[in-house]
């Protein structure tokens, strides 16, 4: 190992260099070493000889580089540069310098430094460093300004190339120069940095010292020796009596030798009797002695055997339940006994209470005689031996947490100490994978247990929180989750109860409750009052007295004092066993916990399946270039094998998945619950196939029902030929149609090349015989359970299609989170391979694998591969393609330098950073390996110019389609003199049956009139905009005229300025619409006459024949529904029926929109040849529009369905693309302006309409009104029909009538506007009895208002007429204005003949007469003069409704509007027209 010191611009850093690693030094915070203002990036790495280099320059002890602000000094230290010296033992000051008298001599130093106060370092934990002002001293890599500084144990000191480390017993030194010293050297080895796996811990095989269990039997003593109770005199007396009788007989009757014989025999009998007696007595005594000796030897041996067994038991107990002091040694030495107990061991959850006389582990058998009259001391000896070994004295007393709740009673501080001992014991011997603790305790007791926070067992990993509940917040945060966990475990047991299968829950939870008040009102109380042992939960209660304990407690422990405790009951049985608790006063509990906290328990060996492996690691490369994709594409052939790496079984043991039909394929299932890595394994497989096979050999069609997440990842992959996301019913059918179309296409190509299998076709394609690429198509559904639930018919058809498509190269991979109830027999039988990751329960595992194994998987990415009927069944770790892609040395590794504080709950809390990341100068997202590989493949595809495969699945129609993407939209290029047939590009159509998407084009001749039916807000107006601009861009304004009827919400108003638009109508413009109807009817008649005249059938034929330009007429109606109930409904509908019936041949076309089909009358609707349905709230209405359809119209703005044989679906185009710099209306205005500027020809005329107000002065110049007056006419206003000038010819008699004098006065004003011109031409005489012309009395030749004056006017008229009759016309004509004709007659009594003469002859002779009067007065008068004048005059202005006047008999006008101010009717030649007088 090497250490590198980097110095630059008063910045000092140290780096521990590890062989094989690379490091970066720069000013970037993400670098391994950050130096401010460095100005360059330095890469550190080893060359092939192991020499460390900085940017390819070797570092030989010291390397100096030029920096922006200062030299960069790199000092490399090796083990040879290391030394360690003890502090001087006598003095309290030492020096380090270049001088011979220094305690530590280093020649390279310029000045000495002084180390002081090291004798008291054990108490103070620091020494003092003294140096002069010329010496730079760094402590912990910070330059010190003071001359005296403290350096604590573990601190690093740097002085002029010398590195020092302060230790409690001395100094560690790194120096490239020789260090000479008389101080004691402590070690010569440089302390190595801990290996990456230093803290990893693996269980060793456990050594179990079993307690003796063999029975020891103490046999009863043998039966006592039976003593011969015969007395000696019984053997002697009979012979003696015989001798005595013989002597008596001899004395009475001597019998010779016979007596001798009798006496001899008797004597012998006596001798033998005496000897026999003493012989038997001696034997008896010997037998008794032997019996006693043998049995006592037996008891002695038994005693030894029992004692040995007791010692073995005591040893076993002491070994497996050591003292806490011994436990400290176990942890300190990282002994293999740590975590030795598992849930499968007999002593799982066993711990020591203290020292007591415990029951023997073996049975001592002895049967005492029930009754014996004689006392046998040997029986007493055996009984004494039996009773002596009743217990094992001073042995550990063991308790366990497996058999119901336990409780501690006594003083709380004593109980807490016992719980601490239990914590230590269980934590040392049980892994935190198997055991966790949860303490519910009082807040004031948390400090006592604070040391336990270091124990990994105190972290509840399922909740990511420390297992301490001591207040309301922690209660709510933890207990609710624990409640849910208990509930789940109870449910799991109930589900397994039918199978009689035992469940072992992991981890076991030890639930310690020292304060019931925290859970008394929590829902978890219902479970706390039960025995939860069956569910992997051990309950421990703490109370002061036994009366406070819950009734379901099985084991009770009474802690009486620190030296006395009692096990009262055990498993509900009374025990009353006293014990002595262990004293742990001198044990550092936190030290044990901290040492244990450093260990990372790895349950599986590293040379087995790795926990994770990245995609590139699986391929054993670091950079995507090393994948050698091009060669793989060139060498791999799908017809031989399709095996690609998917994961690893172990180190360097690749597992491949081969979906060749004769291997693992072609179809399969993937199952895995949320977080199992299901999507990731599919991603890795897709990526692996893409790396190994050319896009012409392998392609993917992704069905991602969850929403397109996976589809987005592969959108740039050339192998991806389609994605299906978020399917509704119609999209499902569309997808199925596309897939079936692909099958038909493949079958057609197979038939063309006389092959019947994809492998044969691929071989022909490789040989160049077949030219169209046809890759294996992998249809992959990421969540088919939901798809099957929502679209069962689609799923059924998909599986069936895949089955049919086996030989066509179709592969189906179905993935699901929960296979239970989803994988039916059809899916199972068609799936040869199964990949099972972590599933929710055993039922799911059985469903996919027919074994429960997958339910036991815990790691993401871990999976079982099953092929066929267990032909292959392997566990492996799948590759993870989501890892960050980084090329060593190419860019800086991003390091999270956030500082976290571990809070009271054991959770990480950032304390130095704004978590938003917005404060960073640059927020950059790292590229994943998947993205890097896809980018690499994309670059290869571009470089090799690989032709894309025809896509079997085209994406769903976009939600925005633009006209410019479908057809040329530059009108400058499209306008021409040649009249073209009209083609309308409506949008983008989708034809899945033909695997085609393209412009939706209608030829107007064939399409006829168009009706679009759709709900409001779904793009009806946009549809019309699209047509308007499509027509306008392809035809000049003189070739296409448009009439826009906007009966909606003024949606057509923005396009009214297009030069092609003749006029624009709204629903409230009744007069204008009525006028348009008349114009359309006239135009129809005019065009029909043309056809008849030239004997052609259509206007297009007329154009070809004559070359004349007759424009196409487009009538576009938005929201035809508004026609109903409108005042003009009948006439408008009649006109539309006529237009739709006759207009097509006349090049007059109708396009309309409506919200329902019955908005039109049946005859009109029948004439609408092209019908289009958009989204309709009433689904049945779609059928009314387009008939029976395969696909419904999606609830998408702009989506439509065209009535045709196949009912083509399309999306309506928009005239302009969205531009953030311009609004839609601005874009319209820009194009309209461009058209207007570009086009210089004639534009269509609008419908002439009467302005709301017409002032004489406004029209005086434009209409040359003075000239008209000079030519003998009075301009009075405009007519409503043509909005043309209306005038009264003064050369003809005229009559003007109105309803009231006020309007007569206004008429007088208009008539006299050009009085000066009139005076020049006429001699004006006015008879004004009512005074309306009074203002002009001084401006005319004669003016009369009085009766006599009026008579004079009458005489003047007659004389003037006579004179003209005699002399002929005068140079100056006369103009007589008779205002109030009725009064004039009454005053003058003018005869009828005079009236006739004035009307008939006056104009010929230059005498012009104008009658003015109130209409009612003229009608009500019975004067014949008025009737004569009315009948003879042909010029009238009548200021009342035609229906109300009585001058003429006209046809009654229904709903004739009231005459407004300044309005009137001009009547001439028995015809009338409505006019408005000038103001």
Curated annotation (Swiss-Prot):
Residues 253-256 are extracellular. InterPro entries: Firmicutes_EssC_C (IPR023839), Firmicutes_EssC_N (IPR022206), FtsK/SpoIIIE/SftA (IPR050206), FtsK_dom (IPR002543), P-loop_NTPase (IPR027417), SMAD_FHA_dom_sf (IPR008984). The keyword Cell membrane applies. ATP binds at residues 672-679, 1014-1021. Residues 1-229, 280-1479 are cytoplasmic. Residues 652-846, 997-1183 form the FtsK domain. Gene3D superfamilies: 2.60.200.20, P-loop containing nucleotide triphosphate hydrolases. One of its GO terms (molecular function) is ATP binding. Its main location: membrane. It is found in: Cell membrane. It is a multi-pass membrane protein. One of its GO terms (cellular component) is plasma membrane. The chain crosses the membrane at residues 230-252, 257-279. Keywords: ATP-binding, Cell membrane, Membrane, Nucleotide-binding, Repeat, Transmembrane, Transmembrane helix, Virulence. The keyword Signal does not apply. Belongs to the EssC family. NCBIfam families: T7_EssCb_Firm. Component of the type VII secretion system (Ess). Required for the secretion of substrates including EsxA and EsxB. However, unable to support secretion of the substrate protein EsxC. Homooligomer. Interacts with EsaE. This is Type VII secretion system protein EssC. It comes from Staphylococcus aureus (strain MSSA476). The gene is essC.
């Amino acid at each position: 190992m090497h250490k590198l010191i980097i110095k630059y611009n008063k910045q000092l850093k140290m780096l521990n260099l590890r062989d094989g690693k690379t490091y970066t030094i720069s000013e970037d915070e993400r670098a391994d070493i950050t130096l401010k203002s460095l100005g360059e990036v330095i890469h550190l790495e080893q060359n092939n000889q192991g020499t460390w280099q900085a940017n390819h320059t070797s570092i030989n002890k010291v390397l100096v580089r030029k920096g922006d602000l200062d030299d960069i000094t790199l000092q490399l230290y090796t083990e040879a540069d290391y030394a360690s010296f003890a502090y001087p033992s006598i003095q309290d000051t030492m020096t380090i310098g270049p001088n011979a008298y220094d305690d530590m001599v280093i020649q390279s130093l310029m000045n000495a430094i002084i180390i002081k106060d090291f004798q008291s370092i054990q108490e103070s934990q620091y020494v003092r460093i003294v140096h002069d002002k010329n010496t730079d001293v760094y402590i912990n890599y910070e330059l010190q300004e003071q001359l005296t500084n403290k350096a604590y144990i573990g601190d690093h000191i740097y002085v002029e190339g010398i590195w020092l480390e302060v230790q409690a017993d001395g100094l560690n030194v790194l120096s490239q120069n020789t260090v000479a010293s008389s101080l004691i050297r402590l070690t010569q080895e440089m302390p190595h940095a801990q290996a990456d796996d230093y803290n990893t811990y693996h269980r060793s095989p456990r050594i179990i010292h079993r307690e003796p269990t063999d029975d020891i039997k103490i046999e009863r003593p043998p039966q006592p020796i039976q003593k011969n109770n015969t007395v000696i005199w019984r053997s002697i007396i009979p012979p003696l009596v015989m001798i005595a009788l013989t002597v008596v007989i001899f004395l009475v009757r001597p019998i010779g030798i016979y007596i001798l014989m009798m006496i001899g025999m008797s004597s012998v009998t006596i001798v033998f009797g005496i000897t026999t007696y003493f012989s038997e007595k001696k034997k008896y005594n010997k037998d008794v002695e032997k019996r006693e000796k043998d049995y006592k030897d037996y008891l002695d041996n038994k005693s030894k055997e029992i004692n040995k067994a007791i010692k073995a038991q005591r040893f076993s107990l002491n070994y497996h339940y050591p003292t806490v002091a011994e436990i400290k040694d176990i942890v300190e030495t990282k002994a293999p006994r740590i975590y030795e107990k598992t849930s499968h061991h007999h002593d799982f959850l066993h711990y020591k209470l203290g020292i007591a006389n415990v029951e023997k582990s073996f049975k001592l058998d002895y049967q005492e005689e029930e009754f014996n009259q004689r006392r046998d001391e040997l029986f007493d000896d055996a009984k004494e031996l039996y009773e002596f070994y009743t217990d094992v004295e001073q042995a550990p007393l063991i308790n366990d947490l497996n058999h119901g709740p336990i409780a501690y009673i006594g003083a709380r501080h004593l109980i807490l100490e016992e719980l601490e001992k239990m914590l230590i014991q269980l934590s040392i011997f049980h892994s935190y994978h198997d055991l966790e603790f949860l303490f519910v305790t009082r807040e004031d007791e948390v400090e006592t247990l604070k040391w336990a926070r270091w124990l990994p067992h105190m972290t509840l990993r399922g909740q990511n929180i420390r297992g301490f509940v001591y207040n309301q917040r922690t209660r709510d945060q933890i207990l609710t989750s624990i409640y849910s966990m208990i509930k789940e475990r109870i449910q799991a047991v109930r589900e397994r109860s039918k199978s009689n299968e035992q469940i072992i829950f992991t981890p076991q939870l030890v639930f310690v409750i020292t304060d019931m008040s925290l859970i008394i009102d929590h829902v978890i109380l219902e479970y706390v009052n039960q025995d939860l042992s069956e569910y992997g939960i051990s309950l421990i209660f703490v109370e002061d007295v036994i009366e406070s304990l819950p009734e379901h407690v099985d084991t009770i422990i009474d802690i009486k004092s620190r030296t006395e405790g009692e096990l009262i009951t055990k498993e509900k049985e009374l025990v009353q066993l006293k014990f002595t608790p262990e004293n742990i006063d001198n044990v550092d509990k936190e030290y044990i916990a901290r040492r244990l906290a450093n260990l990372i328990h790895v349950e599986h060996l590293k040379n087995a399946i790795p926990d994770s492996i990245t995609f590139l690691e699986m391929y054993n490369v670091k950079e995507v270039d090393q994948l050698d994709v091009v060669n793989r594409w060139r060498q791999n052939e799908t017809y031989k094998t399709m095996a690609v790496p998917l994961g690893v079984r172990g180190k360097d043991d690749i597992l491949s998945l081969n979906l060749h039909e004769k291997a693992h394929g072609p179809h399969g299932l993937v199952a895995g619950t949320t977080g199992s890595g299901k999507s990731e394994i599919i991603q890795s497989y897709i990526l692996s196939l893409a790396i190994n096979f050319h896009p012409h050999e392998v392609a993917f069609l992704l069905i991602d029902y969850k929403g397109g997440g996976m589809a987005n990842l592969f959108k740039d992959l050339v192998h991806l030929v389609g994605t299906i996301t978020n399917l509704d019913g119609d999209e499902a059918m569309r997808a199925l149609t596309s897939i079936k179309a692909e099958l038909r296409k493949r079958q057609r190509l197979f038939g063309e090349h006389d092959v019947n299998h994809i492998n044969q076709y691929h071989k022909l394609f490789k040989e160049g015989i077949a030219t169209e690429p046809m890759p294996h198509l992998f249809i992959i559904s990421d969540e088919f359970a939901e798809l099957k639930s929502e679209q069962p018919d689609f799923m059924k058809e998909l599986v069936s299609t895949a089955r049919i498509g086996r030989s066509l190269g179709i592969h189906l991979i179905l993935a699901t989170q929960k296979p239970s109830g989803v994988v039916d027999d059809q899916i199972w039988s068609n799936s040869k391979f199964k990949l099972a990751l972590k599933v929710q329960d055993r039922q799911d595992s059985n469903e996919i694998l027919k074994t429960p194994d997958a339910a036991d998987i815990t790691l993401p990415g871990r999976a079982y591969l099953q092929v066929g009927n267990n032909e292959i069944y392997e566990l492996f770790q799948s590759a993870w393609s989501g890892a960050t892609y980084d090329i060593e040395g190419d860019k800086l590794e991003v390091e999270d330098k956030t500082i976290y504080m571990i809070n009271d709950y054991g959770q990480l809390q950032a304390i130095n950073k704004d978590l938003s990341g917005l404060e960073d100068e640059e927020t950059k997202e790292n590229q994943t390996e998947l993205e890097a590989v896809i980018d690499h493949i994309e670059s290869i595809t571009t470089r090799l110019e690989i032709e894309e495969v025809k896509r079997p699945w085209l994406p769903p129609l976009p939600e925005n389609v633009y006209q410019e993407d479908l057809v040329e939209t530059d009108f400058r290029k499209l306008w021409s003199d040649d009249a073209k047939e009209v083609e309308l590009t409506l949008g983008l159509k989708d034809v899945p049956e033909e695997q085609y998407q393209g412009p939706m084009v209608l030829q107007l001749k064939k399409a006829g009139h168009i009706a679009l039916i759709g709900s409001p807000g779904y793009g009806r107006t946009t549809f019309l905009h699209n047509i308007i601009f499509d027509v306008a861009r392809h035809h000049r304004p003189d070739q296409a005229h448009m009439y826009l009827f906007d009966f909606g919400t003024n949606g057509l108003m923005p396009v009214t300025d297009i030069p092609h638009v003749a006029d624009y109508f709204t629903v409230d413009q009744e007069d204008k619409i009525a006028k348009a109807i008349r114009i359309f009817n006239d135009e129809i008649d005019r065009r029909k006459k043309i056809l008849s005249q030239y004997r052609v059938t259509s206007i297009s034929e007329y154009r070809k024949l004559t070359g004349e330009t007759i424009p196409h007429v487009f009538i576009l109606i938005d929201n035809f529904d508004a026609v109903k109930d409108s005042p003009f409904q009948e006439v408008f509908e009649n006109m539309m029926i006529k237009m739709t019936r006759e207009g097509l041949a006349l090049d007059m076309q109708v396009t309309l929109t409506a919200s329902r089909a019955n908005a039109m009358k049946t005859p009109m609707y029948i004439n609408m040849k092209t019908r289009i349905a958009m989204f309709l709230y009433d689904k049945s209405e779609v059928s009314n529009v387009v008939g029976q359809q395969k696909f419904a119209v999606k609830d998408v703005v702009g989506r439509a369905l065209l009535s045709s044989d196949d009912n083509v679906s399309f999306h309506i185009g928009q005239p302009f693309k969205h531009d953030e710099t311009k609004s839609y209306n601005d874009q319209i205005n820009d194009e309209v302006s461009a058209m207007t500027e570009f086009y210089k020809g004639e534009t269509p005329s609008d419908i002439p309409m009467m302005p709301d107000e017409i002032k004489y002065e406004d029209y005086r110049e434009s209409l040359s009104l003075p000239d008209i007056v000079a030519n003998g006419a009075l301009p009075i206003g405009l007519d409503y029909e043509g909005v043309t000038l209306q005038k009264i010819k003064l050369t003809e008699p005229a009559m003007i009538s109105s309803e009231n004098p006020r309007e007569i006065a206004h008429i007088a004003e208009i008539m006299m506007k050009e009085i000066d011109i009139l005076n020049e031409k006429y001699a004006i005489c006015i008879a004004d009895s009512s005074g309306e012309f009074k203002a002009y009395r001084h401006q005319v030749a004669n003016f009369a208002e009085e009766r006599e004056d009026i008579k004079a006017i009458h005489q003047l008229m007659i004389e003037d007429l006579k004179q003209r009759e005699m002399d002929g016309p005068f140079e100056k004509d006369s103009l007589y204005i008779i205002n109030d004709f009725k009064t004039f007659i009454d005053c003058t009594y003018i005869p009828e003949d005079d009236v006739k003469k004035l009307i008939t002859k006056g104009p010929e002779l230059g005498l012009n007469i104008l009658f003015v009067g109130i209409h009612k007065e003229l009608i009500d008068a019975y004067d014949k003069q008025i009737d004569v004048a009315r009948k003879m005059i042909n010029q009238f202005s009548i200021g009342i409704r035609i229906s109300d006047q009585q001058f003429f008999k006209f046809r009654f006008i229904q709903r004739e509007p009231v005459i407004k101010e300044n309005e009137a009717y001009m009547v001439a030649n028995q015809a009338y027209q409505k006019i408005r007088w000038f103001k």
